[in-house]
Amino acid sequence: MWFKNLQLHRLPAPWAVTADRMEKWLAPHAFQPGSSVEMQRVGWASPRDDGALVYSINRQMLLVFRAEKKLLPASVVNQVTKARALELEEQQGFKVGRKQLRELKEQVTDELLPRAFSIRRDTRVWIDTANGWLVIDAAAQALADDVRSLLVKSIDGLPLAGVQVARSPVAAMTDWLLSGDAPGGFTVDQDAELRSSGEGGATVRYVGHALEANDMRRHIEAGKQCMRLAMTWDDRISFVLTPSLTIKRVTPLDVIKEAADPTAQNDDERFDSDFTLMTGELARMLTSLVDILGGDRQDSVPQPAAA
């Protein structure tokens, strides 16, 4: 249930959009399996496999972006194309030109696509309409871009914005390393990456290692800055902070795992409970994180009329 990565975006808080309105926006872009000759197909899928494209509880929504892609390695296409080109050269008595080779490669690709295996990958999107967050569970920026692209295409006038904080995450993480601690209920853990901004970009990584203040000071005085820092919030959630405010390796700790509702009687009730717990904890953590970075500088975003 828990998101592993948090690509953060801002919405108006509150955002007056209902689950029914969201469902109508997404429906024209529902996922449909690709044809035998399509390389890739994307769309919205049901989070609970019940036909609904939006799962909603307590003003929190869950969406699922589904991508289907044909597995057709370039090496296979190139190998078959090369063999076809040799055959063609023998037939016509001269070397295949660039244009002819390109056309041959396209022909080979079209022939192989129907026989290629397909793989589907789902990416979850959490929308907190109460607190104005839209969060994509994606580690790779390219995947997050694909999800955002479909969101913008699907949702009329989506008032989406980046998170703008008063203090640079790099400057803040570097200062926290120097002091060995972070404010606001956050603690510094034992993973960090420091990188020089100079030529060559000399990099030092610590993994599961005590971050001694003297070592950190030596690296920072040499011109390095902290580019990744493992942290824990309120002894409840551990994560890795990055310069772009993308949060990675999100892990709920024991105190949260023990808070799971023991009275849930079935899968639906457990899902409701787990999603409510996750969104509540993450919303509180994100508020605290923005606070220790000087607050949210995002200008007020125009809000669409309530649906």
Curated annotation (Swiss-Prot):
Pfam families: RdgC
Annotated function: May be involved in recombination.
Family of this protein: Belongs to the RdgC family.
A cellular component term, taken from the record's GO annotations: cytoplasm
Alphabetized InterPro entries for the sequence: RdgC (IPR007476)
Gene Ontology MF terms: double-stranded DNA binding
Highest taxon above the source species: Bacteria
Keyword set, alphabetical order: Cytoplasm, DNA recombination
Keyword Cytoplasm carried by entry: yes
Signal sequence residues: none
One GO term of the biological process aspect: regulation of DNA recombination
HAMAP family documented for this protein: RdgC
Location of the protein in the cell: Cytoplasm, Nucleoid
Organism: Burkholderia cenocepacia (strain ATCC BAA-245 / DSM 16553 / LMG 16656 / NCTC 13227 / J2315 / CF5610) (Burkholderia cepacia (strain J2315))
Name the UniProt record assigns to this protein: Recombination-associated protein RdgC
